[in-house]
Each structure stands twice: as C-alpha cells, then as structure tokens.
Amino acid sequence: MNSLSYLNHELAKFPSPEFALTDPNGLLAIGGDLHPKRLLNAYYEGIFPWFNENDPILWWSPDPRAVFVPGSLKVSRSLKRDIKRRQWRFSVNRAFNSVIEHCALTRQGKEGTWITLEIQQAYKALHKYNKAHSIEVWDGDKLIGGLYGVAIGQVFCGESMFHLQSNASKAAMAMLHQHLLSHRYRLIDAQVMNPHLASLGAKALKRADFINLLKRFRDIEVASDAWHPQEVQIEL
C-alpha cells in the first residue's frame, strides 16, 4: 500500500515515485525545504514541488505524465501569422527574474495559485546555478510573454508561463521547442496532462515509462552555450 512520506530539513533521498498516492494523483511526500540541492534531486528523480500559499511543501510525481518531444508542438497557422505580423523578439535567459515574477502575478486570484515568494526565491537560486532557464517574448522593449523551467541533462522540465498579449505564451512555447531541438534535448516534461496540453501535442506517458526516459537522458550534457543569455530568432 502506498503511503505519504514526511521529509525533514536534512538532504535525504526522496522515496521512489512508484510509492506516490493515487488519490490525490501523484502526491509522494510532504515537508522538507526548497534548497537548490533538494530541488535538483527532485527533478533528477521525476519529482516536482507544487503547493498553495500557507500550505506545507508538497512533492508530486503524477501518473500519467504529460510530455512533449522537442519539435512536436502543434503551431497553428493563425499563431504563425500572429507572430510574423507582430514582429515580436525572442530571447533566452535575458530576464529570468522578471519572467517568474510575471508568472506569479498573472496567477494571483486563480485557483491553484502556487508561485509563492518562497518558490520564486528557490527558482531564482536555481537560475544562478545555471539549472533554471527562461524564454522571453518582447514587443519592442516590453516583456509580454515567457516561460521558465529546469534543465536536467537532455530533459527540460517546464514550470509555468505567462502572457500580457494574446498568443505570447504559445509563441514562447514554440521558441522553446525550436531552441531545445537545436541543442539536442530529447524530452520536455509538462507534468500534469490536461486538454489544453493535449491540443498542443502533449502525450500522456505512464509514470514508469517517463521515469525510464528520464533516467536515459538526465546524465547527458548539452552544449555549454545552450543557455547563455542571448537573442534568438524563431523560424516558422
């Protein structure tokens, strides 16, 4: 019988994802902290934090798992036209802090708001370790969309996105897929499957299959310049 594990502030190993609860789906552990080493240990094992403000830290590994193969995003003709018409600019790791802060702001008041100040500080620390990264969308000098996530070997674990203009977050996803494909990434972890992700081309993998792919790709290094702060051009 699966049971919930309780973590202390020592950097102990996580329990295996196979022991996660089925209800709620994927809840594996509670407690601990968001120290960069613990966070990286979590992603390395296919586990991520997700909890509401004023709640204890909750650690998840749902079954099934939503994933993309880089390049598999369904980009509609209307989105392609929109990107070309608006002449947006794109960048990598030029404004990570602003991206995560915008993600937090645009979620305020929504059910499931989880990008707390504690979460923001934790992922900003990961960014300093060159493990958390962002894609930015600009209209002139104004940041109008973006996303962020964590890179583990050839796997990119998406966390959240935002838009201040219509389609800007989808444009960020399209840029992410192109960037990951060009740097030989093999898998994008989109965490929890939903109809929106399915409409964009995400597939639902059994957790065991996802973990096997993660183990296959997580120790393979990518080019050192993949996440240097840079302007990038989208190809449609």
From Swiss-Prot:
Which reactions fall under this protein's catalytic activity?
N-terminal L-lysyl-[protein] + L-leucyl-tRNA(Leu) = N-terminal L-leucyl-L-lysyl-[protein] + tRNA(Leu) + H(+); N-terminal L-arginyl-[protein] + L-leucyl-tRNA(Leu) = N-terminal L-leucyl-L-arginyl-[protein] + tRNA(Leu) + H(+); L-phenylalanyl-tRNA(Phe) + an N-terminal L-alpha-aminoacyl-[protein] = an N-terminal L-phenylalanyl-L-alpha-aminoacyl-[protein] + tRNA(Phe)
GO MF terms, alphabetically ordered = leucyl-tRNA--protein transferase activity
Q: Which InterPro entries match?
A: Acyl_CoA_acyltransferase, Leu/Phe-tRNA_Trfase, Leu/Phe-tRNA_Trfase_C, Leu/Phe-tRNA_Trfase_N
Give Gene Ontology CC terms.
cytoplasm
Q: Cross-referenced Gene3D superfamilies, in alphabetical order?
A: Leucyl/phenylalanyl-tRNA-protein transferase, C-terminal domain (3.40.630.70), Leucyl/phenylalanyl-tRNA-protein transferase, N-terminal domain (3.30.70.3550)
Any keyword Cytoplasm? Answer: yes
User: Where is this gene product found?
Assistant: Cytoplasm
Q: What is the purpose of this protein? A: Functions in the N-end rule pathway of protein degradation where it conjugates Leu, Phe and, less efficiently, Met from aminoacyl-tRNAs to the N-termini of proteins containing an N-terminal arginine or lysine.
Designated name of the protein: Leucyl/phenylalanyl-tRNA--protein transferase
